[in-house]
């Protein structure tokens, strides 16, 4: 009883710890790069002519289904094999088959989480700004999807902290919650959807039709993670008294999800996010989130990183608890 429970919970803990220590192993190759290649191939060959929305739905929807069902069927085969061997009394081979599920799951979780890399990149923005404004613009351009060539120092710091809050949900909390309920197929599919949205889920002329499905699906799968992230951030900061304001300000964002973690961080730091954003020639006026329009400093970065790292640990604990409850429920039902 204990061994199967450990096999189906420990991968999350180990994968999380590996991410905290090692960060993204880009030199070894990364599944997200492969996801991006598949998405880019479809966009290049299908995002033209008529019926773009339909073509985007069929191609990107197929990628989502493939990403979920291929590992699901593989792990189901291994799990059935383990169950048969346990039934026949061959415990050693049964244990081996469960390990064949757990080890790839651990590696997959490690690759899908981006907590350390996110913090490193945001710190790099503030460090680059201390060198020059141009260096700060170049560095922040690595983590935001808009034109950074005309940003002021304050706008660069704001963009970095906005990204820190938003990607805490997309890159850490969301993947862990997905794994706690749906295992490795869930976390892979979540990141496929998230990558599609980051590549083709824009409202400009080029992507509005083709990326419609990807954008809406990303909105759907992030409804719970984004709000959970905001709540965990407030707990991490010891500011649950800001919960109502966080949800009020979070609703102002043009995205149905991004505003909640951003609002939590802005209110805790007593600063303000939002305002005009230049998306490569197209200016988008985002509603202001937060109450105090002031200059951001290195102290704000330190506080934001502290909240982020505490939130990651809280999300880990929550995800492990949910996973354990799900396993116990399945065992009880069977």
Segments predicted by a language model, with ranges:
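Hydrophobic alpha-helical transmembrane segments
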Residues: 1-188, 193, 201-334
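RNA/tRNA-interacting regions in translation and RNA-turnover enzymes
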Residues: 198
